[in-house]
Amino acid sequence: KQLTALTELGELSQGIVLLHHAILAYPDWPKWQEIVGFDPQFSGYRIGETIRTEIADPDHPITRGVEPWEMIDETYQMMNAGEGCHVLLTCDHPRNAHTLAWTRQYRGARVFCYQSGHDDRTWVNPIFREVLRRGILWTAGRI
């Protein structure tokens, strides 16, 4: 049922926002790999890590005017976003994928994937919230 709903979102050109663990939600679905832009397998995580977030594309509407920042979040040891993904945020944490946030197209839908957002230590960060807000607006075609 979920797979059918997601497939229909792409056909209806509805925006898709995937936050934190949602990126890894269906690792055995080939269609999910098409939506997120890589094989969503991971080999480990660690909660409460300090992550220095870097801006990969300072000209994208989601990241325009955003400066690099640090936040406390959960790290994921997983693959980086793949071909067809437009990388927005990165980090060099040794226990995390290099890619933190990216956009892509899935059929007619704009997709925004943002690995961050584990708990309140991340959510209190105003830059994290602003990037997420802009990501939602971007998927809706409003910026």
Where are these regions (language model features)?
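Extracellular ligand-binding/catalytic regions of CAZymes and related secreted enzymes
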Residues: 96, 106-143
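Stable alpha-helical elements in mature extracytoplasmic
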Residues: 2-5, 28, 58, 128-132
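Short alpha-beta junction capping motif
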Residues: 1-26
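Catalytic beta-strand/loop cores that center a nucleophilic Ser/Cys/Thr
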Residues: 38, 44-111
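Glycine-rich, charge-decorated loop segments at or immediately adjacent to ligand/cofactor-binding or catalytic sites
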Residues: 24-35
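Short glycine-/acidic-enriched loop or helix-start segments at secondary-structure transitions
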Residues: 1-2, 27-29, 99, 123
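Solvent-exposed loop/turn segments at secondary-structure junctions
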Residues: 22-26, 93, 118-121
